[in-house]
Amino acid sequence: MSAPHDPPRPEPRPDLRSLPLDRLERLVAALGERPFRARQLHRWLQQKGAASLDELTDVPRALRAALAEATTLTTLERATEQRSVDGTIKWTWRTHDGKLVESVYMPEPDRRTLCVSSQVGCAVGCTFCLTGTMGLARNLTPGEIVEQVHRANRRIVELGEGQGPRPLTNLVFMGMGEPLANYRSLKVALDLLLSEDGPNFSHRHVTVSTSGLVPMIRKLGEETPVKLAISLNATTDAQRDALMPINRRYPLAQLLEACRSFPIRNGRRITFEYVLLGGVNDSLEDAVRLARLVRGIPTKVNLIPYNANPGLPYRAPAPERVVEFQETLAARNLTAVVRKNRGGDISAACGQLAAEGGPGDPRRPAPPPLTRLPAAG
């Protein structure tokens, strides 16, 4: 007698906010509607950031009812909002399945930037990053990525800090997660965010940061026009192996070769992010090696003094060492900028995002003891 079979699971309903225009066109055709309805939906969802189907006031009620049956619509619930003394705002968003992710808004006189998350947690495991202590819960969908932008835009207007449907000017994919490890969702989200019928961000104002997934760096360069940032943080393989386990798979030589072949458009440069860890990677010898490593690559270096995280065994560099490091790079004709510490008082600075598994979360394991890094070669 054969064992009973479980009934087949129904296909999950597509998420409207994750659908590019061509998918919307196929959807409305399947529902018996004319093609112009797809562009109408696209504008509501991606340009105006509609939070519910009820907001689609010029879409027939019958079509809205059919969409409600055939699809879902990604929404993020704002779980917390924290404002720093410097004006930075950190939002924690709750997803439909109860996961928590964070976005950080950084206003400046000439721009309004949102730091966007791409995953719930992160599997890369950089030893100086609090997000890395969480592990990876799951990837975010394209809709969950772009919804961070829509929700931020709406909230900025509510707070009186911007006007129009899109007060944000810049996006940086430097939040929770490794964006290139969720490339499929990232690519769809980028297409939606750059769309003329959507938020219409300029590719010059969108930056994707990676810890060094070499094959996906090449893919990003081939398939999108956005800017690239590399989280480098070390000048030898021995150093980087200890700080960033991904280096054991894609060592510095491979990473830098991918950077050299990355298409540079309109005189733009690759940004190399370098977190300065006191007594670990902040020697002047490191600065000299860094200049040598990036030689021949159109480069901007962002120096990031380490932001202290309780439970992680690192310390910030001495202020005078930061200046000396920067001057050593400048003497070798490198543009090096010391990034301002934004939102440190609300744990919104670089390496501090951990909506789940943070220092106060009893589920978070104790960090391993720090061992001395191998001597730089």
UniProtKB/Swiss-Prot annotation:
Q: List the disulfide bonds.
A: C115-C350
Q: Where does [4Fe-4S] cluster bind?
A: C122, C126, C129
Residue span, Radical SAM core domain: 108-345
Can you tell which superkingdom this protein's organism belongs to?
Bacteria
UniProt-listed Enzyme Commission number(s) = 2.1.1.192
Protein localization: Cytoplasm
Family annotation (InterPro entries): Aldolase_TIM, Methyltransferase_A, RlmN_N, RNA_MTrfase_RlmN, rRNA_lsu_MTrfase_RlmN/Cfr, rSAM
- Please name the catalytic residues of this protein: E102, C350
GO terms (BP aspect): rRNA base methylation; tRNA methylation
Q: Segment Disordered: which positions?
A: 354-377
Which molecular-function annotations from GO does this UniProt entry contain? 4 iron, 4 sulfur cluster binding; metal ion binding; rRNA (adenine(2503)-C2-)-methyltransferase activity; rRNA binding; tRNA (adenine(37)-C2)-methyltransferase activity; tRNA binding
One GO cellular-component annotation of the UniProt record comes to: cytoplasm
What else does the entry mention about this protein?
Answer: Reaction proceeds by a ping-pong mechanism involving intermediate methylation of a conserved cysteine residue.
Biological function: Specifically methylates position 2 of adenine 2503 in 23S rRNA and position 2 of adenine 37 in tRNAs. m2A2503 modification seems to play a crucial role in the proofreading step occurring at the peptidyl transferase center and thus would serve to optimize ribosomal fidelity.
| Membership in a protein family | Belongs to the radical SAM superfamily. RlmN family.
Which PANTHER family does the annotation name? 23S RRNA METHYLTRANSFERASE (PTHR30544), RADICAL SAM CORE DOMAIN-CONTAINING PROTEIN (PTHR30544:SF5)
Under NCBIfam families, the record lists: rRNA_mod_RlmN
Q: What is this protein called?
A: Dual-specificity RNA methyltransferase RlmN
Organism the protein comes from = Anaeromyxobacter sp. (strain Fw109-5)
Give the gene name. Answer: rlmN
